Swiss-Prot record:
<keyword id="KW-0234">DNA repair</keyword>
<dbReference type="GO" id="GO:0045002">
    <property type="term" value="P:double-strand break repair via single-strand annealing"/>
</dbReference>
<dbReference type="GO" id="GO:0000150">
    <property type="term" value="F:DNA strand exchange activity"/>
</dbReference>
<dbReference type="GO" id="GO:0000727">
    <property type="term" value="P:double-strand break repair via break-induced replication"/>
</dbReference>
<keyword id="KW-0233">DNA recombination</keyword>
<dbReference type="GO" id="GO:0006301">
    <property type="term" value="P:postreplication repair"/>
</dbReference>
<dbReference type="InterPro" id="IPR041247">
    <property type="entry name" value="Rad52_fam"/>
</dbReference>
<feature type="region of interest" description="Disordered">
    <location>
        <begin position="349"/>
        <end position="435"/>
    </location>
</feature>
<dbReference type="GO" id="GO:1990814">
    <property type="term" value="F:DNA/DNA annealing activity"/>
</dbReference>
<dbReference type="Pfam" id="PF04098">
    <property type="entry name" value="Rad52_Rad22"/>
</dbReference>
<dbReference type="InterPro" id="IPR007232">
    <property type="entry name" value="Rad52_Rad59_Rad22"/>
</dbReference>
<comment type="subunit">
    <text>Part of a complex that includes RAD51, RAD52 and RAD59.</text>
</comment>
<dbReference type="GO" id="GO:0000730">
    <property type="term" value="P:DNA recombinase assembly"/>
</dbReference>
<dbReference type="GO" id="GO:0006277">
    <property type="term" value="P:DNA amplification"/>
</dbReference>
<protein>
    <recommendedName>
        <fullName>DNA repair and recombination protein RAD52</fullName>
    </recommendedName>
</protein>
<comment type="similarity">
    <text>Belongs to the RAD52 family.</text>
</comment>
<keyword id="KW-0227">DNA damage</keyword>
């Protein structure tokens, strides 16, 4: 019991020694405050890293006690929000600190984004202020102006980027494989692989059908396969798992023609059927349907590769003869419930630019006349202008206005009056003080 208290006190003393130290310049950031002053602060992620280094990753916890929205203003589609948050930081021994934080967002276009940023900034501010209560190493030294005036003179070099210190996915896989290997070796030695002995090959004299039918082979119990470790299973994997499990074309052809042979008599595999292949020097290329018959007539082509222009797929239903070009039969139209003449159908679906007459007027027998543009009248045709009367000019009487007479204005002295200033006489017009 005494040893536990001593160890706990030693741990507390170590934590207290770390908390008494002040922050280095690499942990301190600056921002513009009110006016021209610069405010020193510590970022939230740096404060969390310091807490993990001092207390341990499982030596402290944070709890959001409350979040309050103080105000929310909307003006011209932009939102301004202010939030207050209370956060408590508790250590593993029950010691806790609690403080308040504030977060604001101004002129945000999205309402949800404004709430998110305001609440997060309020919680982060409250967390930093709660951690500040534990000591200088967690941000309490930033309120010492004498310390801030001296820390600005301390120079430091930013740490170099260490690629070997990155957490990679390959590291996790290596740890898992190493743990599996240690577990397998700790359980005991792996069982050795033993291949079941094959039965001796029968002699030619013993391979007779009478003996095979008369003496059936005794049924042997299935051999139990030894359990192998996961490493043995990994050794058995090969490249065959990378290919498709579908049967090849040759296997599909041989499935129907394969026959079951007697269990005791081995049957040789049937020879492959002969195939008609073109000569090795024949070029292979894609040609059009019109050039295919000429190419097939000049060179040998396998029957399976011949081009059939009249081939029709069985999976497609053909209702119209595709080999000829003809009008749709009237019987087919009547089956579909269309009793109109073919010309009426064509006039309904007029070409682009054709003006169709309204349905209540008589249609033009020739549907192409309406699509023709109207001829413009020639410019040099004589016109009859004898019936056109020229406009007559009407003279309006002239109006005479009397000339204005000069009116004498009173002789008033000119004065200056300034607009926007109080009435006061200029300095030159002021009365001289009495002597």
């Amino acid at each position: 019991m005494a040893d536990d208290k001593k160890g706990q006190m030693g741990n507390v003393d170590d934590i207290q020694a770390k908390l008494d130290k002040r922050l280095g310049p690499e942990y301190i950031s600056k921002r513009v405050g009110h006016g021209t002053t610069r405010v020193a602060y510590i970022e939230g992620w740096k404060a969390i890293n310091l807490a993990n280094q001092i207390f341990g990753f499982n030596g402290w916890s944070s709890e959001v006690k409350s979040v309050t929205v103080d105000f929310m203003d909307e003006r011209q589609g932009r939102f301004t929000i202010g939030c207050t948050a209370v956060v408590r930081v508790t250590l593993s021994d029950g010691t806790f600190r609690e403080d308040i934080g504030y977060g604001t967002v101004e002129n945000d276009r999205r309402k949800s984004g404004a709430f998110e940023r305001a609440k997060k900034s309020a919680v982060t501010d409250a967390l930093k202020r709660s951690l500040r209560g534990f000591g200088n190493a967690l941000g309490n030294c930033l309120y010492d102006k004498d310390f801030l005036s001296k820390i600005d003179k301390v120079k430091f070099e930013p740490p170099d980027f260490d690629e070997g210190n990155l957490f990679r996915a390959t590291d996790e896989n290596n740890e898992l494989s190493r743990a599996n290997t240690v577990t397998d070796h700790s359980e005991g030695p792996a069982p050795k692989k033993r291949n079941a002995p094959l039965p001796p090959a029968p002699r030619p004299g013993a391979m007779r059908p009478e003996a095979a039918h008369a003496a059936p082979a005794p049924s042997e119990p299935p051999l139990e396969r030894p359990r192998s470790s996961e490493n043995d299973q990994e050794d058995l994997l090969d490249d065959s798992f990378m290919f498709s499990d579908e049967l090849q074309d040759d296997d599909l052809i041989n499935i129907g023609s394969a026959k079951k042979a007697p269990s005791g008599v081995p049957r040789p595999a049937p020879p492959p059927p002969p195939r008609a292949w073109p000569p090795q020097d024949a070029p292979v290329a894609f040609v059009t349907a019109k050039a295919a018959p000429d190419l097939q007539a000049h060179g040998p082509v396998p029957p399976t590769h011949l081009f059939d222009p009249k081939f029709q797929a069985q999976s497609i239903r053909h209702t119209v003869d595709q080999t000829t070009s003809a009008h749709v039969k009237l019987s087919v139209l009547r089956e579909k419930g269309i009793d109109q003449a073919r010309d009426d159908i064509y006039s309904k679906f007029a070409p682009k630019g054709k003006i169709l007459p309204p349905p209540d007027t008589a249609t033009d027998p020739d549907p192409t006349l309406a699509a023709r543009p109207a001829l413009s009248a020639p410019q040099n045709l004589p016109t009859n202008t004898s019936s056109i009367q020229r406009p007559t000019m009407i003279e309006l009487p002239k109006l005479h206005f009397p000339q204005p007479t000069a009116v004498p204005l009173p002789n008033v002295p000119a004065s200056r009056r300034e607009v926007g200033r109080p009435k006061q006489s200029p300095p030159s017009l002021r009365k001289p003080p009495p002597q």
